[in-house]
A protein has these predicted regions:
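Hydrophobic recognition helices of helix-based DNA-binding modules
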Residues: 14, 18, 98-101, 105, ...
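Hydrophobic structural patches
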Residues: 7, 35-38, 128
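Charged, amphipathic alpha-helical coiled-coil/dimerization segments
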Residues: 66-126
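C-terminal regulatory/oligomerization modules of transcriptional regulators
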Residues: 119-149
Length: 149
């Protein structure tokens, strides 16, 4: 399928850029992705939200968070209001990695969007959002049908 094959090219390029950072700091791709996710989405700072938003497995997120804690890159804090609510925060030690990640993300965006007008960039974002929303809808329907059986 054309879209699927092309999407993998984009993902491969992003992973190439991020793999340099992973190698430099001794991180797995998942650990790096979690650090960048927490930086870019501070409102989604629980393990459950990382799983939900990133469509990752609970076990991979849990294992990666434990490793990030051991490397003193993140910290888990229990909510004062709700003992079951554990929030995850980036620590100062993660700042250098996140900065390198931001630079890689900027380079990625600059390179893959090269030659596009502002209007074309806007159109791409809108079309991609529609595609993702359609996929989300069908995933939701599929899960609902499975749960009904």
């Amino acid at each position: 399928m054309y879209f699927w094959d092309k999407h993998k090219t984009i993902t491969s390029y992003y992973e190439l850029l991020s793999s340099r950072i992973c190698d430099q700091y001794g991180l797995t791709q998942m650990e790096y992705d979690i650090l960048m996710f927490l930086h870019n989405n501070p409102q989604h700072n629980t393990a459950a939200e990382i799983v939900k938003v990133r469509k990752s497995t609970k076990s991979h997120v849990s294992t990666s968070l434990k490793k990030l804690e051991n490397k003193e890159l993140v910290e888990r804090k229990q909510s004062k209001d709700n003992k079951k609510h554990i929030e995850i925060f980036l620590l100062d030690k993660a700042e250098e990695i996140v900065e390198a990640g931001i630079n890689a993300q900027k380079q990625f965006a600059q390179n893959v969007l090269k030659g596009l007008t502002e209007e074309e960039k806007y159109m791409c974002i809108n079309v991609f959002d529609k595609i993702c929303n359609n996929a989300e809808e069908y995933l939701r329907e599929y899960k609902e049908n499975i749960n009904e059986k």
